[in-house]
Amino acid sequence: MNLHQTVEHEAAAAFAAAGIADSPIVLQPTKNAEHGDFQINGVMGAAKKAKQNPRELAQKVAEALADNAVIESAEVAGPGFINLRLRPEFLAQNIQTALNDARFGVAKTDKPQTVVIDYSSPNLAKEMHVGHLRSSIIGDSISRVLAFMGNTVIRQNHVGDWGTQFGMLVAYLVEQQKDNAAFELADLEQFYRAAKVRFDEDPAFADTAREYVVKLQGGDETVLALWKQFVDISLSHAQAVYDTLGLKLRPEDVAGESKYNDDLQPVVDDLVQKGLAVEDDGAKVVFLDEFKNKEGEPAAFIVQKQGGGFLYASTDLACLRYRIGRLKADRLLYVVDHRQALHFEQLFTTSRKAGYLPENVGAAFIGFGTMMGKDGKPFKTRSGDTVKLVDLLTEAVERATALVKEKNPELGADEAAKIGKTVGIGAVKYADLSKNRTSDYVFDWDAMLSFEGNTAPYLQYAYTRVQSVFRKAGEWDANAPTVLTEPLEKQLAAELLKFEDVLQSVADTAYPHYLAAYLYQIATLFSRFYEACPILKAEGASRNSRLQLAKLTGDTLKQGLDLLGIDVLDVM
């Protein structure tokens, strides 16, 4: 159920009865549970508009909410707020419904969409590094939530598998007579660094590299064979990282830059024909009045370089056309570093003008900040090098396994390793997903692996705590009437019934930290409930009802963490 909508519906009827039907209700959860479950804040604005006393108008709304099947009490507070407390019977009935629902009371959207989500998208011929972590796990979580809410989700891994870097690599390998040798990703990285130096310092080598790019684009069999080898090695490495992270990305989701090679010139020609792209100093450029350069002139969105070469803009335009025309997207999401914001704003604007992006199709740039070290600078190794993602994840598992062994010395090596992997990978992912994605965040091993506070280990332990209750519970009846008498029983029940509200918010806004904050709230609330309301020592209907609340808490934590891409354990 959508608890917010249910309460808002009741409030709307009360607003109508008070003569302010057209006024915004402004309903939000109370910050202090002692004041109730929800608060209406819209009366003051309505009173100002109607030139009425806000408290008197609020009292009319509160009186209209009397004898309500959903709301137990409505109390006016302050200058015109209305605090709402939900009926225990209403909460109990919906707890029962959620317990008997495989989706825990979360309804699918009544307006499902086909959502194409672009995430991870590393450049190939080099190892993935920490800079790829945020896009990969943020995109994965958003895609999970969208799919769970009933949308058709098409994941697209837009890898950088085309362009100058591959011409450089081919030129270097031919020069070094290694073009027929077998090599691994580490070799490619070494070759790439050497090729980049040659490219920057030797104009003749740079010309040769560009010639190989032309050959690659023209379908030269020898160059294509080398290119395919580079790509296969890189993608195999990337998939291993995705599997370690537990991402939903699969090889069939890869749709790299090379996929759109044949569409680039037609896109540029179409923009020229439509009068959008014009020649400027030999290049093809779309000038956008919506964006200004430093001189206050329309910004230039370059779609073809002088000499005929293509850019990210060309590829992204062709890609966007494909996703709407062939994949039939209703909504496009691009999970990319926040520094690319202007590029995507210009891409969307150009696409709207060209008719590639219809008004009924949404397109959003899902930007994110930088992972920082404790020194406040972008996260690096001690020597200042980029941290390889494989190394980071290996260290996470090793640190978590050591912590698990320290807490449970009796555990066997295999069991400790299994728990350590689940805790370590979960900790890295949650440390990111629990933060507002638009912000930078500090990578801190001690904080993320702590079993206290807003961390994955804390939530995973909360889940195991619930499971331990049921190992001792014996027989109980999940279908017996739920009875809520204690304040913390009612508070936990009300919070559990907000699951759909939170998931819909994540689906709408693409902010996974809303879900993380909700799960942490559930876990901390359950801890307070567990201490104040004995479960196994209670008797009769009270014992059974508390077990029902515990069961739904465990189910919600497990499902919610899964939507963040984090596993749980029955024992830790």
From Swiss-Prot:
Signal peptide start-end: none
Organism in which the protein naturally occurs: Neisseria meningitidis serogroup B (strain ATCC BAA-335 / MC58)
Motif 'HIGH' region: positions: 122-132
Pfam families: Arg_tRNA_synt_N, DALR_1, tRNA-synt_1d
GO molecular function ontology, one term from the record: ATP binding
EC number(s) reported in the record: 6.1.1.19
Assembly and interaction partners: Monomer.
Alphabetically ordered keywords of this record: Aminoacyl-tRNA synthetase, ATP-binding, Cytoplasm, Ligase, Nucleotide-binding, Protein biosynthesis
Family, similarity comment: Belongs to the class-I aminoacyl-tRNA synthetase family.
Superkingdom as given in the UniProt entry: Bacteria
Biological-process GO terms, alphabetical: arginyl-tRNA aminoacylation
Chain's gene name: argS
Keyword GTP-binding among UniProt keywords: no
Family matches, as HAMAP family: Arg_tRNA_synth
Record has Lyase as a keyword: no
Protein name as it appears in the record: Arginine--tRNA ligase
